[in-house]
Swiss-Prot record:
GO terms for molecular function: RNA binding. GO terms for biological process: mRNA processing; RNA splicing; tRNA processing. Belongs to the intron maturase 2 family. MatK subfamily. The keyword Cell cycle does not apply. This is Maturase K. One of its GO terms (cellular component) is chloroplast. It is found in: Plastid, Chloroplast. The keyword Chloroplast applies. It comes from Bromus inermis. Usually encoded in the trnK tRNA gene intron. Probably assists in splicing its own and other chloroplast group II introns. Keywords: Chloroplast, mRNA processing, Plastid, RNA-binding, tRNA processing.
Length: 511
């Protein structure tokens, strides 16, 4: 335990950055507005001039912050519908949102200054184990073939409000900023202790996107920080409670002495003691922990996770949040794919001199398929088809122009194909394309009060071209016009598109 605390204090430094006075500066709120305009997911800031930034209202807000009763009204009237207890709903809405967005930028400043304050001759340590989300699937395809067990983890959230504040206390010593953070958290919760309702989380995430991401990333980085510590100590932790711990150490020393005598001896036999070969991947609120070894070792890691959440984050989690499966006999749902590592048989004919014989081998292959039932359920929920997958019209879109209807259906189809292009089987995607294409035709026919057959004959190839995806257009250049849909080999091609930016929307493209 002392080693655990020492490892924690070594990597956490208290920074003397007092950022609370910046809350009285107008340019902080201008930065918040610029982030909303330039961010990948814009944050709307309401104002009196067509949702544009109003410097006059910001100046009024700063003047009100200087007043003594500014925070007293909000604290003494917790049952008010809006923050800051102001008579005019419009001003209250603007002050609430612009203040929270400005504070979100405020709490990020100490972390930025810490990186800038590093000496030039001392390079900032690079975490080679951190990768972009674009490389997750190639990473799984490359590494998971050699692993045995997989733990599917649901990272628990939300946690105690005070724990979130304490996580930042290690790096921010600005007491007024921490008190202001407590104020925001308590305002968006129904009680003063927990954010227990999903409604409170949704409201907080919707109105304070940047602050929510900052707090969530701080919590997850803290969790992964101690997970890295457990990974470094994994050679000892699985054996700490064993009665034969000393005997195993003695056995390890014997093996090291044996290696000195026989340097050509392979060291791979002691991977259980030396290198458990653990790989960790996280996306949104889910994580995957895959490793070699026995089922007993995975059960140990499950206990470590539960104890870490319970004793450090004060979060009581249920064991069902962690599922342990054997890779060879199960599949896992991750980022919109059903992935597995099955053993496929391979028959090899070998001939030696006059004798020939067959060699039956089994090879592992990382297989990813599209969850057809789940995606058809999304289409059914969005009223593109019935629950069984029968295409229907979209009445709510009949007021749009023909071009807008075609564009919307085509964009949804291209997004599905673009994201799920790495699937090893494309039959499900072609079924989804058929549903969307026929649903589009029914919608246009309903708008013009015609039949589907008549409308498709009148529109011709323009209607079909709208549903071509990028990879299919490449194949179209290689075939004649009579074979536009006979892509006999395209279903075996696996293409991982690494230029996806708004990946969250593509995982669930209809919500």
């Amino acid at each position: 335990m002392e080693k655990f605390e020492g490892y924690s204090e070594k990597h956490k430094s208290r920074q003397q950055y007092f950022v609370y006075p910046l809350l009285f500066q107008e340019y902080i709120y201008a930065f918040a507005h610029d982030y909303g305009l330039n961010g990948s997911e814009p944050v709307e800031i309401v104002s009196c001039n067509n949702k544009k930034f109003s410097s006059l209202l910001v100046k009024r807000l700063i003047i009100r912050i200087y007043q003594q009763n500014f925070w007293d009204n909000s604290v003494n009237h917790p049952n008010q519908d809006r923050l800051l207890y102001y008579k005019n709903y419009f001003y209250s809405e603007f002050y609430s949102q612009i203040l929270s967005e400005g504070f979100a930028i405020l709490v990020e400043i100490p972390f930025s200054l810490r990186e800038l304050s590093c000496p030039k001759e001392k390079e900032i340590p690079k975490f080679q184990n951190l990768r972009s989300i674009h490389s997750i699937f190639p990473f799984l395809e490359d590494k998971f073939l050699h692993l045995d067990y997989l733990s599917h983890i649901e990272i628990p959230y939300p946690i105690h409000l005070e724990i979130l504040v304490q996580l930042l206390q290690y790096r921010i010593q600005d007491v007024p900023s921490l008190h202001l953070l407590r104020f925001f958290l308590n305002y968006y919760s129904n009680s003063n202790s927990f954010i227990t309702s999903m409604k409170s989380i949704f409201i907080f995430k919707k109105e304070n996107k940047r602050l929510f991401r900052f707090l969530y990333n701080s919590y997850v980085s803290e969790y992964e920080f101690f997970l890295l510590f457990l990974r470094k100590q994994s050679s000892c932790l699985p054996l700490a409670s064993s009665g034969t711990f000393l005997e195993r150490i003695h056995f390890s020393r014997k093996m090291e002495h044996f290696w000195i005598m026989y340097p050509g001896f392979s060291r791979k036999n002691l991977w259980f003691f030396m290198d458990p070969l653990i790989h960790y991947v996280r996306y949104q609120g889910k994580a995957i922990l895959a490793s070699k070894g026995t089922f007993f070792l995975k059960k140990k890691w499950k206990c470590y996770h539960i104890n870490l959440w319970q004793y450090y984050f004060r979060f009581w989690t249920q064991p069902r949040r962690i599922h342990i499966n054997q890779l060879a006999n199960s599949c896992f749902d991750f980022m919109g794919y059903l992935s597995s590592v099955p053993k496929s048989p391979l028959l090899v004919r070998n001939k030696m001199l006059e004798n020939s014989f067959l060699i039956d081998t089994r090879m592992k292959k990382f297989d990813t398929i599209v969850p057809a039932t789940l995606l058809i359920g999304y289409l059914s929920k969005a009223q593109f088809c019935t629950g069984s997958g029968h295409p229907i019209s979209k009445p709510i879109w009949t007021d749009l122009s023909d071009w807008d209807i075609l564009d919307r259906f085509g964009r949804i189809c291209r997004n599905l194909f673009h994201y799920h292009s790495g699937s090893s089987k494309k039959q499900t995607l072609y079924r989804l394309k058929y549903i969307l294409r026929l649903s589009c035709a029914r919608t246009l026919a309903r708008k013009h009060k015609s039949t589907v057959r008549t409308f498709m004959q009148r529109l011709g190839s323009v209607f079909l071209e709208e549903f071509f995806t990028e990879e299919e257009q490449i194949f179209c250049l290689m075939f004649t016009k009579t074979t536009l849909f006979s892509f006999s080999g395209s279903h075996t091609e696996r293409i991982w598109y690494l230029d996806i930016i708004r990946i969250n929307d593509l995982v669930n493209p209809l919500n």
